[in-house]
């Protein structure tokens, strides 16, 4: 019981770290898209760049809501929120990696080198997908939990 509560806290913490990675990636790609010009206009005027930034922001906000909701419902005196602690870590870590990946794409070659740090953010996000349980472990845990409770609030 004590160990499960610690796992729930760890997974929530990793999800919160994922939010930081995603937020920083969005800030970097947004700034770059405003500063960098191609064909006489800022990158932010191009549809694919807009898509990368908008999707990243929407996913970040969804992840933030999930992290805050899970944190608000966490009971520190007992375990019992395994479904959401697994789910929030699964979603947020994957989201952060995808957002960092988009940031690399927006920055092009600069995204791959250390000058803008998004390559490091991507590596950090990838590590968060593994730490605290792999995505596959979270899929298994969540499916087991859902099959026994079938609670969809």
Positions of predicted regions on the chain:
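Alpha-helical interface subdomain recognition
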Residues: 5-153
